[in-house]
Regions:
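Short beta-alpha junction loops
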Residues: 107-109
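C-terminal regions of RecA-like/P-loop NTPase motor modules
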Residues: 232-240
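Switch- and interface-adjacent substructures of P-loop NTPase systems
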Residues: 1-99, 112-134, 138-141, 145, ...
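Conserved P-loop NTPase
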Residues: 157-186, 194-197
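Short hydrophobic alpha-helical runs that function as membrane-insertion/retention elements
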Residues: 100-105
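Conserved small/polar residues in nucleotide/adenosyl-binding loops
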Residues: 241-248
Length: 248
């Protein structure tokens, strides 16, 4: 069963404080029968849109509405080296319709460089074959430079990353990484993994675009559908039969 664990943290980038809400979803795909296991996650994302919309429509609106909308989904792929699981394809299809999705290969150090590149290529093909929308995608308002940058990132997807909370001393220098049989994996060395490229993409070059895309594409689509449904429900004529039943 999918659970939701929310962690709020503050990071500092170039002297600017950035508050992040991180939502983990332990339990996804862990059951024997995983049919419709994506529904709680999809519902959670839509619920955050609903909360924001209700606050937006209140008579006395807050000056700064607390924003709990999900601006990006980091979808971690098991480093099997083979292909996406059917459950992952279904999940990505559902998520790609309602939020920015960035696919990531987790624990990429378990693959050789050749295996990693072959796996990335297969995943990109599967995303395309299944018409799965992942971030970044081109927009008609983008200029040539923005389109070129997007093309470079799209060719790199899914990001192959290695994570670690440990810092080692290597030749007198602190190195965040993982110790393996082949030696030290430095997660901030671009020749070892793509963590640095992913971090820069997520928190520096594309942070504001992720927020804008959520607001003007996904949330606006949700908002329009909700307001249209509200308008249609309020405009429905009252059934004459229903009125007669109440009169009697």
């Amino acid at each position: 069963m999918v659970r939701f664990k929310v962690l709020t943290t503050v990071i500092i980038e170039n002297g600017v404080k950035l508050k992040l809400n991180l939502i983990d979803t332990p339990g996804y795909g862990d059951l024997i029968n995983n049919e419709h296991c994506w529904e709680p996650i999809v519902k959670y994302i839509k619920d955050q849109y609903s909360i924001y919309l209700r606050k937006e429509l209140t008579a006395v609106r807050e000056r700064h509405i607390p924003d709990t909308r999900v601006h990006v989904v980091l979808f971690f792929i098991n480093p099997s080296g083979h292909s996406l699981r059917p459950i992952d394809i279904q999940m990505l299809k559902k998520l790609g319709d309602i939020a920015n999705v960035i696919p990531i290969i987790a624990k990429a150090d378990t693959l050789t460089m050749e295996e990693r590149e072959a796996f990335k290529h297969r995943v990109r093909n599967e995303l395309q074959e299944n018409s799965i929308r992942v971030y970044p995608f081109d927009h008609e308002d983008y200029d040539d430079e923005e389109r070129e940058l997007n093309s470079q990132v799209q060719a790199m997807l899914p990001f192959a990353v290695v994570g670690s909370t440990k810092v080692y001393d290597v030749d007198g220098m602190p190195v965040r990484g993982r110790q393996s049989r082949c030696g030290m994996i430095n997660i901030e060395d671009p020749s070892h993994c793509e963590f640095v490229q992913f971090r820069n993409f997520l928190l520096r070059t594309n942070l504001h675009d992720l927020i804008d895309t959520t607001t003007y594409t996904y949330y606006e689509s949700f908002r329009s559908k909700q307001l249209l449904a509200l308008k249609e429900s309020s405009a429905k004529p009252v059934s004459y039969t229903h009125l007669r039943a109440h009169e009697t």
